[in-house]
Amino acid sequence: MNAELELLWPLSGLLLLLLLGTTAWLCVQCSRPGVKRNEKIYEQRNQQENEQSVASSQTYSLARPVRTGLQMDAASNKSFERKNKLLFSHLEGPESPRYQNFYKGSRRESDAAYVDPIPTDYYNWGCFQKPPEDNDSNSYENVLICKPSTPESGTEESEDYQNSVSILQWRESKRTMGARTSPSGSPDEEPDYVNGDVATTEKI
């Protein structure tokens, strides 16, 4: 029996501990201030909304003017006439205005508020058009900046360039220095490039 009692004590202690924990958890859940506070807020809000809706319906019913039968008939007739006017306005003749500033038909009669639009000639520069006579003074043309000089060497290509005088002077300077001149545009006009360092290293 001693062995059985020794086994029952820890088991009963564990069972008691579980029971105590469950009870404490339930107490905490029920007495949580956040849950109760939220429920109270919802209850207060619902009560305020109900009170406001009742108050607004009471004020609406009190503020609503009391109408007699003739006034109600006249008001309903006005709304009926307005609906008919809107529905059947397209059936009216073309002479009657549908809008305040819009008139159907021609606009030949002058209106005090009407302003003529700017003519298209203003935008198309009609006043600056070319005169009918054949005057080419404003047209584009090639303009020579300097007077063309007569080439001394007789080449016709040098006349095409503005710096032809400089080219001729350069050719004359080459002649005076003893360099041979070749016709312009030939491949022998400039000496070929020779890599002198490579040639010297091959001989060594």
UniProtKB/Swiss-Prot annotation:
Entry-annotated residues carrying Phosphotyrosine = Y60, Y140, Y161, Y193
Entry GO terms, CC: membrane raft; plasma membrane
PTM comment: the record says: Phosphorylated on tyrosines following cross-linking of BCR in B-cells, high affinity IgG receptor (FCGR1) in myeloid cells, or high affinity IgE receptor (FCER1) in mast cells; which induces the recruitment of GRB2.
What is the membrane topology noted in the UniProt record heading this document? Single-pass type III membrane protein
Q: Residues bearing covalent lipid (S-palmitoyl cysteine)?
A: C27, C30
Question: Where in this protein does the record say Phosphoserine is found?
Answer: S61, S96
Q: Where in the cell is it found?
A: Cell membrane
Per the record, which residues fall in region Disordered? 147-204
- Keyword field: Adaptive immunity, Cell membrane, Immunity, Lipoprotein, Mast cell degranulation, Membrane, Palmitate, Phosphoprotein, Signal-anchor, Transmembrane, Transmembrane helix
A single GO BP: adaptive immune response
Q: Which residues lie on this side of the membrane: Extracellular?
A: 1-7
- Drop me one GO molecular function for this one: SH2 domain binding
Q: Record's InterPro entries?
A: LAT2
Q: Which domain of life is it from?
A: Eukaryota
- Enumerate the Cytoplasmic topological stretches: 29-204
* Bilayer-crossing regions: 8-28
What's a Pfam family in this record?
Answer: LAT2
According to its UniProt entry, what is the function of this protein? Involved in FCER1 (high affinity immunoglobulin epsilon receptor)-mediated signaling in mast cells. May also be involved in BCR (B-cell antigen receptor)-mediated signaling in B-cells and FCGR1 (high affinity immunoglobulin gamma Fc receptor I)-mediated signaling in myeloid cells. Couples activation of these receptors and their associated kinases with distal intracellular events through the recruitment of GRB2.
Under the subunit heading, UniProt states: When phosphorylated, interacts with GRB2. May also interact with SOS1, GAB1 and CBL.
Q: What is this protein called?
A: Linker for activation of T-cells family member 2
Organism the protein comes from: Rattus norvegicus (Rat)
